[in-house]
Amino acid sequence: MPRALWTAWVWAVIILSTEGASDQASSLSCDPTGVCDGHSRSLNSIPSGLTAGVKSLDLSNNDITYVGNRDLQRCVNLKTLRLGANEIHTVEEDSFFHLRNLEYLDLSYNRLSNLSSSWFRSLYVLKFLNLLGNLYKTLGETSLFSHLPNLRTLKVGNSNSFTEIHEKDFTGLTFLEELEISAQNLQIYVPKSLKSIQNISHLILHLKQPILLVDILVDIVSSLDCFELRDTNLHTFHFSEASISEMSTSVKKLIFRNVQFTDESFVEVVKLFNYVSGILEVEFDDCTHDGIGDFRALSLDRIRHLGNVETLTIRKLHIPQFFLFHDLSSIYPLTGRVKRVTIENSKVFLVPCLLSQHLKSLEYLDLSENLMSEETLKNSACKDAWPFLQTLVLRQNRLKSLEKTGELLLTLENLNNLDISKNNFLSMPETCQWPGKMKQLNLSSTRIHSLTQCLPQTLEILDVSNNNLDSFSLILPQLKELYISRNKLKTLPDASFLPVLSVMRISRNIINTFSKEQLDSFQQLKTLEAGGNNFICSCDFLSFTQGQQALGRVLVDWPDDYRCDSPSHVRGQRVQDARLSLSECHRAAVVSAACCALFLLLLLTGVLCHRFHGLWYMKMMWAWLQAKRKPRKAPRRDICYDAFVSYSERDSYWVENLMVQELEHFNPPFKLCLHKRDFIPGKWIIDNIIDSIEKSHKTIFVLSENFVKSEWCKYELDFSHFRLFDENNDAAILILLEPIDKKAIPQRFCKLRKIMNTKTYLEWPVDETQQEGFWLNLRAAIRS
C-alpha cells in the first residue's frame, strides 16, 4: 500500500509539472518570424520549451525572479531579449552564454543588487544594454563591459542606491551612440572614469545636485557631441573657468531637461557657453527659473556673447515669480550671434522691441503656444527688428485679425516663411498687405471659411488644412505646394489657377471622384495625397484608377487610404479592389440589349399567338371570366330549353326542316333554342350565347365540314366552349352530319377533339331506314 501511494504521488508531481510548463508555454504568442510576446502575462519564471526558432522574446512586466543557466540555452538565434520590469534578483553566471547572436538586452527595473561581467562575456554582437532601475550601488568589482566591443547604447544606474562611478567601470568601451547614467545620489566620481570612452554621441546624465558635474564635464568635454542634463537642481552650481579653459572641446549641443536655475546659476551656465567654444545649440526643456531675471549685479556684463551658440530652444519654461521678472535688458548684448530661437509654451506675450533689434543675426524665430496678440506683436516687430529673419512661427497664439497681422509684419523685409496656424482668424478680408518676399504661409486650423485675394501672389507653399473651406478658386501663379486636407472640398482645384503646382495634399475632404483629365491638367504634379475621401466608385472612376499602373507613383497614400463610399455593396472596400457588375458599367448597352430582346420576345409572342391562336385563348379567358361572375349552373326553374343547337348556316335546312320537325312536333315536344329565332335582338352576342347555353338542358353541336369552316360556328364555340367543357358534364351532344376529317378540327378546340376521340357521338345515317333510330337516340340523349 505505501508503495502504491508513493507511485501515485510521483505521477501527480509529473503531471502537475507538465501542466505548469504547458500553461507557461501557452502564455507566449509567437508569430512565424520568431517574434514571441509574453509581456504582462503574470509569469513567475521564464517559460520552458523555448527553441532556436525564437528570435525576439518579450517577457517584460511580469513577476519573474530568477534567470537560470538552462532557461535560454536553446535560444541560440535570439536577437532581442526584454526582461524589464520584473522581480529578477538573481541571474546565474552562464544564463546568456548561448546567446551569441543577441543584439538587444533589457534588464531594467528589476532587483539586481550585483552585476557580473560573466553575464556578457559571450555577447560580442550586443548593441543595446539597459541596466537602469536596479538595486546595485556600483557597476561591479571588475570591468563589466570589456567584452562588448559593438555596444552602441548603454543605460546604467538608478535613482537611489547608485552612488559610485570608478575608473574601471567603462573600460573597454570606445564608442557609444548613447550613454545614459542615472545617478541622482552620486557621491563618488573618480576622475577619468568616463575619459576611457573615446567618443560619445549623446550622454544623458541624471543628477540631483551639481557637486560632481564639473568633474564629469572635464572628462567628457573633448569626446562628447551632445550633453543632456536631467532632473538637476543647479541652485548651487558654480563653474570653474580654470578647469576647462585650456582644453579642446567637442561638445556641440547642451540640453537641460527638468533643471532648476537661479539668477546666479544661470549666469554660471552662460559662462560655460562662453568657455566651451564648440557649443552651437542649447536647449532648455521643462525647466524652472527660480529668480526674477536681475542679472545686472552678477558680472554678466563681462560676458560679451554666448560663445558660438547659434540655436537656442526653450520649451515649457516655468517662472514662479513671473510678474516680478525683469526686462532682461542685461542679456540683450549676448544675443547678437544667435540665428535660431525657439521659445515654446512658455507664456511669452511680448518680445521687447530693443531685444528684437539686438537679434541682428536671427533667421528663425518660433514663438508657438504662447500669448502673442496683434497689440504685442506690433511692439515686437518694430522698425529694425529681426533684420534677417526669414522664418517666423506664431502657431497657437492669440492672433485674431489676418489683415492686421500681415500689416504688422511689413517691417520684416526678408521674411519668406510665416506660420500663423491654430489662431482664431475665422474670416479672411478681401485684401491684405504682406512682406514682399513671402513664399510660405501656414494658415491651417484657423477656422477660416473661404479664401480671398488677401493671400500674397508670391506664395510657393500654402497650408490651409483643417479649416472649413468648401472651394478653392484662387489664382496663385507661383504656388508649388498646396496643403488643403481636412476641409469640405467636393472636387480638385482648377489646374489653370495653379500652373506650376507639384505637390497637393487634399485628403479627408468630401471629394467623391476625380478623373484622368483632371490629373493630367496639372502638368507638373508629382505628388498627390487624396485619400480619406468618400469616393463614389463609378465605372469610369474604377476604370481610370485601376487601369493606371503609374498612379501609385503620384498618389503617395495609394491604395490603402482610397476607399469606396458607394455603391453600398462595395462600401469600405479599397478602390483598387472594388468590382462592379456589367449592368452597372454598361447601362446603355444593357438597356439597348434588353429593348432588343423585348422586341424580339414580343415579335416571337405575336408569331406564336398567330400560329397557335393565342388571341382566341385570350378571348376565351375573358369570356370565361365574365361567365364566372354568373352562377355556374342555372337553377332548375330557369331552364327554358331542352337543347341549344349550334350549327352552320349552310346546314340550316337540315336543322330547321328535319331536326326541328322531329323534335318540336314530337309528343311530348322538345323545345329547342335556335340563334335565328331565340336570340334577343340588341343584346351582346356573348351574353346571348352564354344565357342560351345556361338556360338549355343540353347543347347540340351539328358537326360538318361547313361547321368547321363556318366563322359563325367558330364564333359561337369561341364563347361557349370554355364553359361547356370546364364543367366536366355530359351536356354536349355531338351530331356528325357528314363524315369529317378530325384533323380538320382546329387545334384550339382541343377538348372537342378529345371528346370525339373518347366519347360516342350520333352520326346521321344516309339510309332512310336507319334515320328513325337516329331520332330515337337523339331524343333519349336530350332527356338524359
From Swiss-Prot:
The membrane-spanning stretches of this chain are: 588-608
> Does the keyword field hold Flavoprotein?
no
Question: Which domain of life does this protein belong to?
Answer: Eukaryota
Record PTM? Ubiquitinated at Lys-754 by PPP1R11, leading to its degradation. Deubiquitinated by USP2. Glycosylation of Asn-442 is critical for secretion of the N-terminal ectodomain of TLR2.
**Which ranges carry the LRRCT domain?**
525-579
Q: Which SMART domains match?
A: LRR_BAC (SM00364), LRR_SD22 (SM00365), LRR_TYP (SM00369), LRRCT (SM00082), TIR (SM00255)
Q: Where would I find the LRR repeats?
A: 54-77, 78-101, 102-125, 126-150, 151-175, 176-199, 200-223, 224-250, 251-278, 279-308, 309-337, 338-361, 362-388, 389-414, 415-437, 438-457, 458-478, 479-500, 501-524
List UniProt keywords, sorted A-Z. Answer: Cytoplasmic vesicle, Disulfide bond, Glycoprotein, Immunity, Inflammatory response, Innate immunity, Isopeptide bond, Leucine-rich repeat, Membrane, NAD, Receptor, Repeat, Signal, Transmembrane, Transmembrane helix, Ubl conjugation
Q: Which residue ranges are assigned to the Extracellular compartment in the record's topology? A: 21-587
User: What is the role of this chain?
Assistant: Cooperates with LY96 to mediate the innate immune response to bacterial lipoproteins and other microbial cell wall components. Cooperates with TLR1 or TLR6 to mediate the innate immune response to bacterial lipoproteins or lipopeptides. Acts via MYD88 and TRAF6, leading to NF-kappa-B activation, cytokine secretion and the inflammatory response. May also promote apoptosis in response to lipoproteins.
Indicate what this protein is called per its UniProt record. Toll-like receptor 2
